[in-house]
């Protein structure tokens, strides 16, 4: 399975999965149709699947247009997003499996950013060294999504599930927010050497127009404050020992950063 990162809108990423043997493709969270159609044309591939993580317009905006071009494709989304995702036919819940070509993925129910958010995890297969996590707006490189419909307790539970995946899991998040996320993280953990080094690397990468997605879960666990709510450094910075309260305060600070 090959993965293509397609920039869209101002800071979105659409991910196109390609099975070269069958010459079929799937897209994750298509914000707009043009990047997808251009990539499909270059590959000469047929789009058979849309995997949506949640209902927001910058994640489902191209669904209708892509269905018009490929009327036999299937749209997947969360069970609790019923009626909110255009063209949705498959309604997924925690522990369900999805198939793309010869790859089988697991569905995680990860409410927080929205009440119905899901993520798709494809574990390593064969000689591949990394698993692939398509997490929408749940984890960002260096951050996490705002809590529009969910609670801090829900998000802590959701991130706990994803944090338990192997460190070599690639994090395919849907926005290029990394530099600003790490600027905020440094206000919380200014003495974190791993974070300092990552910020320097990302600053250079972005100045040269390079993407910072995907990242690796192992790096996120060392540098992303929203995966470190239960470390003493973050607890001390937030003035609490209660994980949910710590996370809520952390998210509140980021909302106003």
Curated annotation (Swiss-Prot):
EC number annotated for this UniProt entry: 3.1.2.6
Cofactor details (free text): Binds 2 Zn(2+) ions per subunit.
Sequence positions that bind Zn(2+) 2: 58-59, 137, 175
Alphabetized UniProt keyword annotations: Hydrolase, Metal-binding, Zinc
Named cofactor requirement(s): Zn(2+)
GO terms of molecular function: hydroxyacylglutathione hydrolase activity; metal ion binding
GO biological process: methylglyoxal catabolic process to D-lactate via S-lactoyl-glutathione
Catalytic activity annotation: an S-(2-hydroxyacyl)glutathione + H2O = a 2-hydroxy carboxylate + glutathione + H(+)
Residues involved in Zn(2+) 1 binding: 54, 56, 113, 137
Pfam families the UniProt entry points to: HAGH_C, Lactamase_B
Pathway where it operates: Secondary metabolite metabolism; methylglyoxal degradation; (R)-lactate from methylglyoxal: step 2/2
Catalytic class of the enzyme: hydrolase
Function: Thiolesterase that catalyzes the hydrolysis of S-D-lactoyl-glutathione to form glutathione and D-lactic acid.
UniProt record similarity statement: Belongs to the metallo-beta-lactamase superfamily. Glyoxalase II family.
Subunit structure: Monomer.
Protein name as catalogued: Hydroxyacylglutathione hydrolase
Organism this protein belongs to: Gloeothece citriformis (strain PCC 7424)
